[in-house]
Structures are given as structure tokens and as C-alpha cells.
């Protein structure tokens, strides 16, 4: 499945980096390479660009950039210091770019399990090599832990109610898909229709928990 993605604030990013043609730069959240490709256009043969991403799909997409000045590394941006040390560029980098958060291709691909509006597996892993999925959390975590995740990570006012209902329902049948869970949460919360889907906060909370985003 192919996705098109327009890089955020592209001109502002390039201006902020104040790119030197022979400089060393790091795109710590490579994504689909929109920013990286533009940075490369401003580098001469002595310039270097290193891309980082925890998403294996992003690392695979980076292979399309056949440029000796560019290197892709499968890593979260939280490991930036270690990566720079291993690459021998610690203290030599002229600029670093971070576009933090879930990316459009991740949300748009139902198979990644981030969307509460498109059916897919309860996954939500930004790094597919990690073992913890949303399905594991939803079907195995205690009522107290689920309530904590929904309340603290999602600021969900009905955290305890949703957690209690999930634990009760999964005893009958484990949750398997995103739409199954989102529609269930919608029914549990109830009330009048709202512009924002009622599962939004719980899905955000699960994504943060799966990817340990607050530890990044």
C-alpha cells in the first residue's frame, strides 16, 4: 500500500536548520523522508544526513533514497546520543530535526491499528519489532491498570467505566480489531453524539502506552 505524505512546515524547517552545504544533519523522525529529501538537495558532496526511525516501514521506505550522503538507522529518537556516538558524529552535528508523534502513513494504514475509524488489528506499535501491542494491553491488563492508562495518558473522564466494561466484555470474547474496540467504547461512554469520536482519548492512551511515548 502506497501513501503520499506532505512534510509539516517544510520551508520553516529548512530555514530553521540554516543548512550548510557541507554540514552534518540528523532527521531523527524520518517518516517517509519528505524533510530528508529536501535537506539532501541543499547538501554538497561533503554533506551528510542521517535518518532515524523506529518504524520498520519507514526504514524500508528510506531504501528508495540511493544517495551515498544518506544513512538510515532503525532507532527511536530517544537513542539519539547513542546512535550519534556509534556513527562517530557526536558533537559534530550541525542540526537535528524531530517531528514528534504518530505519522500520517501510520494512521492511514488500517493494518497498523492506530485508527478508530478504519478496521484493523489492535496493534498500534510504531516499532513492529517490539512485542507489546494494544491487543495485549486491552485483553490482559487489570482493570486498575487500564483505568490508569485511560485517565493519565488519555485524560478520559470515563476511564474507570470504560476499563470495567472492557474487563467484563473480554471474559466473553477478547477484543481483536480497532473498530470492535472503538464501537464498544462509544457504546460504553454513551451520551449525545459529539464531533470527536468517543474513543479518541482511549485510543490515544493505548498508543502512548504501547510505544512508551512518555519515556522518549
Q: Could you describe each region identified by the protein language model?
A:
Residues 1-216:
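S-adenosyl-L-methionine-dependent methyltransferase catalytic core, i.e., the SAM/SAH-binding region
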Amino acid at each position: 500500500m502506497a501513501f503520499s505524505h506532505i512534510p509539516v512546515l517544510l520551508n520553516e524547517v529548512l530555514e530553521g536548520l540554516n543548512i550548510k552545504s557541507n554540514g552534518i544533519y540528523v532527521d531523527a523522525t524520518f517518516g517517509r523522508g519528505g524533510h530528508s529529501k529536501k535537506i539532501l538537495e541543499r547538501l554538497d558532496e561533503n554533506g551528510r544526513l542521517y535518518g532515524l526511525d523506529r518504524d520498520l516501514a519507514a526504514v524500508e521506505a528510506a531504501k528508495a533514497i540511493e544517495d551515498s550522503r544518506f544513512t538510515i538507522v532503525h532507532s527511536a529518537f530517544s537513542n539519539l546520543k547513542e546512535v550519534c556516538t556509534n556513527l562517530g558524529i557526536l558533537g559534530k552535528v550541525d542540526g537535528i530535526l524531530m517531528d514528534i508523534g504518530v505519522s500520517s502513513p501510520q494512521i492511514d494504514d488500517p493494518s497498523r491499528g492506530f485508527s478508530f475509524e478504519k478496521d484493523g488489528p489492535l496493534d498500534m506499535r510504531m516499532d513492529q519489532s517490539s512485542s507489546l501491542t494494544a491487543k495485549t494491553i486491552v485483553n490482559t491488563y487489570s482493570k486498575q491498570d487500564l483505568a490508569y492508562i485511560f485517565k493519565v495518558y488519555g485524560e478520559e473522564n470515563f476511564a474507570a467505566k470504560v476499563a470495567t466494561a472492557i474487563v467484563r466484555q473480554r471474559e466473553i470474547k477478547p477484543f481483536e480489531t480497532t473498530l470492535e474496540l472503538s464501537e464498544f467504547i462509544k457504546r460504553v461512554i454513551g451520551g449525545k453524539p459529539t464531533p470527536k469520536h468517543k474513543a479518541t482519548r482511549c485510543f490515544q492512551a493505548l498508543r502512548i502506552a504501547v510505544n512508551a511515548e512518555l519515556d522518549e
